[in-house]
Amino acid sequence: MGRYAIEPENPAKSCKARGEDLRVHFKNTRETAQAIKGMHLKKALRYLNDVIEKKQIIPFRRFSGGVGRKAQAKNFKTPGSQGRWPKKSAQFLIQLLRNAESNAEVKMLNTDALVIDHIQVNRAAHLRRRTYRAHGRINPYMTSPCHIEMFLVEKDEAVPKGEDDTAQKKKVSQKKLKKQKLKAALSGGAD
């Protein structure tokens, strides 16, 4: 079992999944992972399935050189509304999310309350091939695989704030207090 970059705060309420040397583009996978970070598990799976069907888009923020502008990307705060639909990256992330979900079921966690707390994509070792060019030359033909790690945390439901019986007093600055006193003194002197 490999090491994770960080460990969850409460291991009993979390589940992990990781994949190493995955034959999928690093840059596309990194952008896809950032798009689902912080989402609930069910919402992330639905979103990634929509990406595969091109109903929703992945905004490209860091690795956006040469990425075309799409109307769907306007919904995100993306500079230049750049985005793509990285199908293979979405499929790999769906597999990892399903793996994490089954790990959560083994640990008896509530899968409806799982949130993606940590997801990280690292570069893996390049796979080297060659392509043959004109005049007897040979050029490298490299692939950029990646490692993916994630953990999901079971979030507790937010407790609503209790209402106070006493109304809290508004804080008033010194300048406003002086103005109020001056007004009171002037209006009191007129009577």
Swiss-Prot record:
Pfam families: Ribosomal_L22 (PF00237). GO terms for biological process: cytoplasmic translation. Residues 159-191 are annotated as: Disordered. GO terms for cellular component: cytosolic large ribosomal subunit. Residues 169-182 have a biased composition (Basic residues). InterPro entries: Ribosomal_uL22, Ribosomal_uL22_CS, Ribosomal_uL22_euk/arc, Ribosomal_uL22_sf. Residues 159-168 have a biased composition (Basic and acidic residues). Keywords: Ribonucleoprotein, Ribosomal protein. Gene3D superfamilies: Ribosomal protein L22/L17. CDD domains: Ribosomal_L22. One of its GO terms (molecular function) is structural constituent of ribosome. PANTHER family: 60S RIBOSOMAL PROTEIN L17 (PTHR11593:SF10). Belongs to the universal ribosomal protein uL22 family. This is Large ribosomal subunit protein uL22. It comes from Suberites domuncula (Sponge).
